[in-house]
Amino acid sequence: MDLPQALMQRGDRHGVRLLIAPTFALPDAALDAILSWRLGQYLLTRFYDADVVADQDLVREDAATVHSADVHGIAIDADGGLLTYLTLKQPEELEGFRYGSADRPPFPCEEVHGRSWQESIVDTDDVPAEQCWELARFITDQRRPDEPLIHRGALEIALVAARLASRPAFASRVRLVTGDLDPDIALRNLRYFFIPVATFAPHQVTLPKGHPLRPRYADHPTSPFIANARDLDWATFVRWADIDLALNSGEEETYLRFLLLRQFVSVKESSLKRPNAPRDQSQYPVEALTSPSSLGASDALWRSATSGAIPWQALTLGPGEPLPRDRVSWIVEGFAQALTYRPEGLAHLAGIGPEVCFVPHESIAASIASLDAATPLRVLTTTREDFESFWRQRQALFETSSEKLYGMTEIVRAAKA
């Protein structure tokens, strides 16, 4: 794990070690091992066509598809076993091109989905292409899906990679992140991390016969996506701090905290996405449904609530006053803090402000000790049913709908095991 040219190395935390390094920093044997592991995991998920892999005598993925500056993130257990892997990659020879250049080299996701979906995004054409990266191969060890350490590894490497890309030393090199995803898994998990992405209706893609990834796209509807690093704001960074606090706790407390954090959601959408126009009549104002930021939506909802046009209540609270615990709370202005129980007393659970809602889940709500205003606060409250009705309408226009609204289902399963 001692690589002088690594971008980040972290020692053991509750059984997980982390490494993020470019290809040129990895020994050849390490890269070969990673490519073999990637091939094996994609066979286990049935993303690869096993017959094609056998016919081509593949024992690892093709090293020719890995470029010198590609970045590899790995979470490793105490025995050196790989728990989770991800990569950020680019095609070669992007220098001098803009993201919107028609003749620039394509990213791998564009080779699958084409580029017509980019007609529905804005403010990307003039971004230097070398400031865009594709997030790919984010996968956990499929041989031990029920081990809590596997889920911890995924959370640890995702958090560290996101934070690293946001640091001043790297932020100028990472403006856009693209790729493709399964909306019912990856999209909800990005939502859990408060990372808004522009995405599109999932569809199936037929790759040429003999392509090893043909089953991945023929059998699993996927969507291309793109994220804007400038959409990350204080709400995102506070969320990451709350996730980090959970990961820094003991195993049982970690997964309880992740359960409880599902009750705090971001309603922000990507600034890159041009939303569809509402087709159906709605009691909610158009601005509330189509403003990417919830700040614009908040103002429209506040006006509608104060006029009685929607079944929401507008409240003004002072520091120390409790928010209602049996209703959704949409923060319009100010900051609130949620505390939870620990053996030695109460402890911080989550900080919430504009762009964040508290959505009580009846089965676990009692584990939140308090939810109080920390500053003067304007908040909208409503029932969970009415909030979810609004949220689904809003997601439909941005094409970010998923079957389930709340992320990290895998963590919930691990916590209940």
Regions found by a protein language model. Give the residues of each.
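Charge-rich, low-complexity intrinsically disordered segments
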Residues: 198-280
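Acyl-donor binding region in acyl/amide transferases
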Residues: 99-221, 356-359
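A short helix-loop-beta-strand connector motif used in the catalytic cores of GNAT acetyltransferases and
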Residues: 62-74, 94-97, 312, 326
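Cyclic nucleotide-binding regulatory domains
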Residues: 96-110, 314-375, 384
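Short acidic (Asp/Glu) patches
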Residues: 54-70, 102-122, 364-366
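Short amphipathic alpha-helix that is part of the acyltransferase structural core
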Residues: 5-60, 72-82, 87-90, 277-309
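Acidic/histidine-enriched, beta-strand-rich ligand/metal-binding domains
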Residues: 366-415
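Cyclic nucleotide-binding regulatory module and flanking cytosolic helices
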Residues: 27-31, 267-319, 393-401, 406-410, ...
